[in-house]
From Swiss-Prot:
The gene is lipB. PANTHER family: LIPOYLTRANSFERASE 2, MITOCHONDRIAL-RELATED, OCTANOYLTRANSFERASE. HAMAP family: LipB. The keyword Cell membrane does not apply. Keywords: Acyltransferase, Cytoplasm, Transferase. This is Octanoyltransferase. In the reaction, the free carboxyl group of octanoic acid is attached via an amide linkage to the epsilon-amino group of a specific lysine residue of lipoyl domains of lipoate-dependent enzymes. Pathway: Protein modification; protein lipoylation via endogenous pathway; protein N(6)-(lipoyl)lysine from octanoyl-[acyl-carrier-protein]: step 1/2. Belongs to the LipB family. It catalyses: octanoyl-[ACP] + L-lysyl-[protein] = N(6)-octanoyl-L-lysyl-[protein] + holo-[ACP] + H(+). It is found in: Cytoplasm. It comes from Psychrobacter arcticus (strain DSM 17307 / VKM B-2377 / 273-4). Its main location: cytoplasm. Residues 50-278 form the BPL/LPL catalytic domain. The record marks 187 as: Lowers pKa of active site Cys.
Amino acid sequence: MPNTMQALNTQPLNDTLITKSITAADYVPTLDAMLSRTLARIALKKEQGLRTPDELWIVDHNDVYTLGQAGKEEHILQRTNTPIIKTDRGGQVTWHGHGQLVMYWLFDLDSVGWSVRNMVSHAEQAIEDVVNDCLKSPASTDTIHISARARRDAPGVYIYADTAAEIDSAHRSTDEIKVDNTIMIGKIASLGFKIKHGFSYHGVAINLNCDLSAFNAINPCGYAGMQMLRLADFVNMNQATTPQPNNPTLTDDAKTITYEQFTQKLIDNIAQRHAGVIPLRELAPK
């Protein structure tokens, strides 16, 4: 069945950012559509001087493993029936599938006034903001005092726990990094972008309530032993792993968080960053 693309119900803070949604998306047609749209925007700017609205694509992918430009076959540990696609984004190997929120950033970096480093940091900090809001909400089941944060030495968003807390083996990475009396226990979000003539595409993937066993067949992002985590490990989440219509917005007293509520909250944060309302914080320590 072909992908279906539709406008997502959102109200960004300016008219220079459009959001679109694709459900049950096969990877190759989605990549082709991203590249086609990016090339068209580049041509309009170069040939006619036209600036087109930036686009944020919210994607629910069918199962797929993708290899970035730095991807090595040795990081694929098991061959399964899941397709393996080589792609032009940055980074190594990762998995996409239902229950994971993928957001593709089709941005004109010159128009928004960002460097590539700015964009990566905005993406990481937006995810940090929303994950940490969820961890502090009544829906949280956290008992080990965790928080989400980025690292300077490895793109993405990671979960850190207070070193004084009792951390079981299910929540402990073999690649432990200690920062400010906390210990990194795993990764919840991955990033991989491609820049072409100042325009970005590809983006971020956040594990919400997906089946993490798919990561067992790979070294996620090229890191052997990296523990992949999901929001549902620490927050009460609705069990639906694909977008559901007519879910209310996330409220401060919500005891359960849905895929759509998290998505909307993240869209709002990104839209405010795109509009210059939310500035970058100081970069995370190494």
